[in-house]
Swiss-Prot record:
Reaction(s) catalysed (UniProt annotation): L-seryl-[protein] + ATP = O-phospho-L-seryl-[protein] + ADP + H(+); L-threonyl-[protein] + ATP = O-phospho-L-threonyl-[protein] + ADP + H(+)
Short name of any one Pfam family annotated for the protein: HRI2_3H
Similarity remark: Belongs to the protein kinase superfamily. Ser/Thr protein kinase family. GCN2 subfamily.
EC code(s) of this entry: 2.7.11.1
Keywords of the record: ATP-binding, Kinase, Nucleotide-binding, Phosphoprotein, Protein synthesis inhibitor, Serine/threonine-protein kinase, Transferase
This protein's name: Eukaryotic translation initiation factor 2-alpha kinase 2
Annotated ATP binding sites: L177, G178, R179, G180, G181, F182, G183, S184, V185, K200
InterPro entries for the chain: CC_SR_Kinase, HRI2_3H, Kinase-like_dom_sf, Prot_kinase_dom, Protein_kinase_ATP_BS, Ser/Thr_kinase_AS
Residues of the active site: D417
Gene Ontology biological process terms in this record: G1 to G0 transition; negative regulation of cytoplasmic translational initiation in response to stress; signaling
Post-translational modification: Autophosphorylated.
Amino acid sequence: MRFFNAHKSAEDGNYSETTNAISLKNERQSRDLSVNKHGRMLLTALLENFCQLYDNNPAKSKRLFALICHTLQKIGILEEEYIEELAAVRSNYQDALHHLILQAREAIRLDDAEERLLALPDPTNVFEKFPQETALSKFSVDGLNVRQFRFRDLTLESWLQSRNSRYIEDFEEYSLLGRGGFGSVYHVRNKIDGAEYAMKKINSTFQQMSYSKIFREIKCLAKMDHPNVIRYFSSWVESTTEATQMPIVMSKNSSRVLGTSSYCDVNGMDSIIFEPTESSALTDDILFAEDPGTESIISTSRKSSYSSTTESSNFENLESPRNLHDSNVSTFNNTTILDDDYSSSMHISKTGPTHSFIIYIQMQLCFDDLESYLIRRNHFLSFPLCKEQIQLHTDLFRMIINGVMYVHEGVNLIHRDIKPSNIFLAKSLPEDRGSVPLISYNDKNDLKEYITPKIGDFGLVVENKKNTETALSFLERNHLPNLQDETQHIGTATYAAPELLDAMSSQHNKFTKKIDTFSLGMVLFELLHPFQTNMERATKLQDLRRGNLPEEFVEQHICESSLILWMTAKDPTKRPSLLEVLNCGLLLPNQVSMPNISNIVSTNHLDVETQMKLIMDENQRLREQIAVLRSRIQHLETR
């Protein structure tokens, strides 16, 4: 037993050393990335300033600046620091550099004054000048003698971080709702209008994707206007340092909002875009996470949750980044001991700048999402659902379809990350567009209330290029899902279409709107089939990905089963369009369970014979639909 414990202790020690080494390596890589971005942004700011000096015409100076930067980008000196969206950040750098020059001139002036003062001898006490001269010792910088204390006071970051922050001045931060590959999401209150919002922060330090792609989600949100799509309010960019960022307040009662992206996932059901490690690069491609409790397609490391109704244990996984002080500092007799690697990393941290810029996206705050709702519902209901519940959930699904159809047809985009955690539920009124009745199952409340489902988290959205191939860039190809990599967790493979999973083995893939159709088919099945355990859910969702539905589900839902199998066909060309899904007859608005007053009045004026004829016609229409759908099921089973 002693030998076993000693052996285990040795293994733990080796593991700890390996973990520390990896942490230090990631820290250095992150620091190098920050230094490179810092330098490129400063160079770009200088170039813009020079171009403005060479030509007083603003339009011509902009063209000159763009041409020079584009040329430098081709040879690898710059990336996309010159894009219009980063003009405010470049302006901050220009102001900071101007301030630094003023500091340096003042330091030189004071240095010259000290030189003249020290040149005068003091006859009363000759020895007093030695400690003074030692304190004011000089060192050489490119042949110029500069006093250390003067040079040490010169800093670029002090000016950058002293600028007023719109976020700090205008918003009160309540809690961290979630964090992930495309940023962190916070629950905030605007001090001016008093309203509460979801604020997504994207820190450029952790982004290894191009700047233009960082702004893609913002531009997509800005042009969307639909009741079943999350609402966008504003966005802006600020320069920041670690010292100026607000402290993170993590609340276990936080609300689930659009992750975000991603943000992007995170809960006891299924994670979206959250918490990439330092080694995982962030691109606009799909990086898939496993579904907790699912027979994993792709392994992941940590998960997090910010759903207000998800079990509190899920919040324990929202860990802060590894603290190097904890992993590399030892104590012995109350004496702190630093190992060599940690001392080296401390030196690197001192020399590298920590400045970055943050993109703020102000969006609608939703206090619930479909994933959290399904968790609550499954505690109260079991399969099969009653007729009323089926109608409530099909009405809900119809509104979800409307939102995704708007994304496809209204703004010509493909979401690529449709799943329950990215479908948000906002409280609404019966007369609001896109609202449906639903039982919340909050606090044992079984009363119906009106909610509006909203599609959110557009961090993985892409343009729908009809009849064209979407070529994957080198960056995308090298950061698509790695089945052996446990650090990749953007997106969830459970709901992802097969062609997305196949993208890792091909440089060209035809990404169409049918990607979202597949994901919606998975969501429909989950809406109509309550699960009692995560294992049951995992097994049946994976079976559906293979084209199999439970026999008891098919018996209860013949038409719905056909629709689900149609939507989740492996071949995207065999999947229906969302318009075909809406017109198939299964998602007709409910006119029986919650009719409008006008409908009740008009119905009362119909005679009995007319009502019977309407019922018989509807019955015949449904029989014909069942026959068609059965033939489709047989066709799918014989493939």
